[in-house]
Structures are given as structure tokens and as C-alpha cells.
UniProtKB/Swiss-Prot annotation:
Alphabetical list of SUPFAM superfamilies matching this protein: Thiolase-like
Gene: CHS2
KW Transferase (keyword) present: yes
Record-level Gene Ontology MF annotations: acyltransferase activity, transferring groups other than amino-acyl groups; naringenin-chalcone synthase activity
Active site (record annotation): 168 (acyl-thioester intermediate)
The name this protein goes by in its record: Chalcone synthase 2
Species for this entry: Oryza sativa subsp. japonica
Binding-site positions, CoA: 59-66, 313
Pfam families assigned: Chal_sti_synt_C, Chal_sti_synt_N
CDD domains on file: CHS_like
């Protein structure tokens, strides 16, 4: 029997990274088809043959006007909807058509975002060791993770994790998972992709399901990708954008029916009650205290905010609950205005917007000149993801990080 002289503790030490996980690059993508919110009520009621529902259309018009959204992007063009009329009826069986569409398009949009992130990262794809792919729709085998790995030409040894049907909180989830992977696997480079196409949920209006109309006033399509890794290789010009300091998830008791989605023959149905913003805003103070108490941070206006903009009421009530200055939510409100709610991808768009606004405004760090920041994801459960971030200096030596 041969006795090894290597101790398990030493093996474990060699397996782990030395430093904290960081976001090294961010990329985003949207479908080409852009819809403006001012035009959408007329368009939506026309393509769904619902113009006779004048009172309902007026209500939808008011929803769109109060959404704080200027425009959104969607894979569904009028031509596609004309070819799939069952998708325009509230209760018509249409799952096969929706599934075929989403299974094909989600990886394509994810690939586009991933290519942008990889371009900014500036390293060969052979260095990607892990792939985390997240989408709300299009469950299939092999999954979207496999398809995008194949499209990108990632190494066949890449370690994949596929996350389906998590919903809007999952933009935080993927960062939490990527942090664990990067810090526990020396040299790991994790490609994270969130790709969301809401074709599963599009349908005509119903006078008895007004919360479905709320979703139609908010949701858009988009994909975001990030590269996460520890111990940036400065010799290869790897540069962090944000360090991922800590990550936690919590379920809000008694809220399991607050945001509900069900996959049916008619597609994905969802329930969005009016008290969701109140549930979320009531939870934020406790989440902040738990996350920042160990760091000695107590002033919530002294940190930068990267918040999933599920809708204007969520941002408004969170802002009011913790007495935030209006400027703290600017990145989230900008993304809501220009893209709508893109489920899991949205908060990564906000992270991208944060570093760009910080550079455009001449701040010293990627977090509006502040050191500490928080990223929040909210979604079904109700589930709250809380990520503590640390910004990095913006310097002339790192021009690529702001492109």
C-alpha cells in the first residue's frame, strides 16, 4: 500500500481560488423588433382582434401610460403572430407553437449576449470552464445550455448548469451560483447567460384576468451575459468590474401565491396581485441589515443600487421604505424605461447600466463613486436574492470596461 504524502487539506487549498469572485465582463442583446409603449395598446388590441373591447383597451392604455416604460423589444412580430393566430386568443391551445419558437430562439439570443461579454473579456473561449444558463421558458432536452455551448464552440469539457422557470429573481441567483463556482475552483471562468423571450406568455386580453394585462404592459425580451472569475489575470489584461462580496436568498413567509406562473396548453399563465410591491418593499430593510451589518454599513444612500425593476410600483415603494434619494434608482429606472421587465436578464442589464452611467458621469468607481453596493432580485416565492457588491476604480488604464 502506497501512502500519499499530500494531505487532504492541502488538496482542498489548491482547489480553491485565492481571491473573491468578480464580474469580469458584461454583454447584452435584444431582438431587433422594437415596440414603443405609446403605440402598444393600439397594436396589441389590433393584432389580437380585440378592438371591440373598448373599455378594456382604455384600462390597458392607462396601465401602459403609468408603466414608466418608453420602449421594449420582442421576438414576436406582427407577421409571426399572423402565422400563429392561436397565440392571440386568451384560452386557445398553443403550447406546441410557442415551445417550438422559444426552444429555438432563447439560445440564439443568449449566444448574442454571450458573444458581447466574451468580446469585452478579451480572453480565448477555451478559458471558459463553467456555463450557467437561465431562462423562464422553453424547457427542453438537451437544454438551452447545451445549445448555446455548441453555438459558441465552447470546450466539450465545459461544466454546465441549466436553470429553467425561476422567474425574475434569478438574475441574482446566477451570480450567487457563479460566485460559488469561481471561488471553489481555482482558475474557473464562469460564463453566465440569462436569456428571456416571453412568447410563452403572450395572448389576447380577458376582462376576467386583468393581471394578465399588467404583464403585457411590462414584459419585454432580452438576454444578458457575464463572465465571473476569481484572481483576475492582470498579465492577460483581465480587469474586474464589480467584486461579488456575498450572496443570499430568502423566501418571504406567506407569499407563495403572490407571483404565480403555470405552464398550460395555452402557454404560460401568470398571476400578479397588487400587493406584490408592498411585500417586496417590506422585506428590503431586513435584507439590507443582514447583508451589510458585518460591513458596518447603515446608510442606504451611501451604497449604489442595482435593483430588478419588476415594475414602477416596486421601485417607488422600495425607494420610499428605505428613504432613498431619487438618484439611487436611476440605473434601474433607465433599464425599465428602455427595455421593460425582461425577467432574469433585467438586473444584469441594470448592472451594465450602472458601470456605464458611472463612467459617463465621471465617477471614480463603477458604483457611482461609492465602494459598496447591493443587487436585488425579486420573483416567485416570493423569493429575494441579495448580492453585496464592491465597485472598482475607473481609470484611464482600463478603458474597455466602460464600452
Amino acid at each position: 500500500m502506497v501512502t500519499s504524502t499530500v494531505k487532504l487539506e492541502e488538496v482542498r487549498r489548491m482547489q480553491r481560488a485565492e481571491g473573491m469572485a468578480a464580474v469580469l465582463a458584461i454583454g447584452t442583446a435584444t431582438p431587433a423588433n422594437c415596440v414603443y409603449q405609446t403605440d402598444y395598446p393600439d397594436y396589441y388590441f389590433r393584432v389580437t382582434n380585440s378592438e371591440h373591447l373598448t373599455n378594456l383597451k382604455e384600462r390597458f392604455q392607462r396601465m401602459c401610460e403609468s408603466s414608466q416604460i418608453r420602449k421594449r423589444y420582442t421576438h414576436l412580430t406582427e407577421e409571426i403572430l399572423q402565422e400563429n393566430p392561436s397565440m392571440c386568443v386568451f384560452t386557445a391551445p398553443s403550447l406546441d407553437a410557442r415551445q417550438d419558437m422559444v426552444v429555438a430562439e432563447v439560445p440564439k439570443l443568449g449566444k448574442a449576449a454571450a458573444e458581447e461579454a466574451i468580446k469585452e473579456w478579451g480572453q480565448p473561449m477555451s478559458r471558459i470552464t463553467h456555463l450557467v444558463f437561465c431562462t423562464t421558458n422553453g424547457v427542453d432536452m438537451p437544454g438551452a445550455d447545451y445549445q448555446v455551448a455548441k453555438m459558441l464552440g465552447l470546450p466539450t469539457s465545459v461544466k454546465r448548469l441549466m436553470m429553467y422557470q425561476q422567474g425574475c429573481f434569478a438574475g441574482g441567483t446566477v451570480l450567487r451560483v457563479a460566485k460559488d463556482l469561481a471561488e471553489n475552483n481555482r482558475g474557473a471562468r464562469v460564463l453566465v447567460v440569462c436569456s428571456e423571450i416571453m412568447a410563452m406568455a403572450f395572448r389576447g386580453p380577458s376582462e376576467s384576468h386583468l393581471d394578465s394585462l399588467v404583464g403585457h404592459a411590462l414584459f419585454g425580451d432580452g438576454a444578458a451575459a457575464v463572465i465571473v472569475g476569481s484572481d483576475p489575470d492582470e498579465a492577460a489584461d483581465e480587469r474586474p468590474l464589480f467584486q461579488i462580496v456575498s450572496a443570499s436568498q430568502t423566501i418571504l413567509p406567506g407569499t407563495e401565491d403572490a407571483i404565480v406562473g403555470h405552464l398550460r396548453e395555452v402557454g404560460l399563465t401568470f398571476h400578479l396581485p397588487k400587493d406584490v410591491p408592498e411585500f417586496i418593499s417590506d422585506s428590503v430593510e431586513g435584507a439590507l441589515t443582514d447583508a451589510f451589518m458585518p460591513l458596518g454599513v447603515h446608510d442606504w444612500n451611501s451604497i449604489f443600487w442595482v435593483v430588478h425593476p419588476g415594475g414602477p410600483a416596486i421601485l417607488d415603494q422600495v425607494e420610499e421604505k428605505v428613504a432613498l434619494h431619487k438618484a439611487r434608482m436611476r440605473a434601474s429606472r433607465n433599464v425599465l424605461s428602455e427595455y421593460g421587465n425582461m425577467a432574469s436578464a433585467t438586473v444584469l442589464f441594470v448592472l451594465d447600466e450602472m458601470r456605464k452611467l458611472s463612467a459617463d458621469d465621471g465617477h471614480a468607481t463603477t458604483g457611482e463613486g461609492m465602494d459598496w453596493g447591493v443587487l436585488f432580485g425579486f420573483g416567485p416565492g416570493l423569493t429575494v436574492e441579495t448580492i453585496v457588491l464592491h465597485s472598482v476604480p475607473i481609470t484611464a488604464a482600463a478603458p474597455l470596461i466602460m464600452q
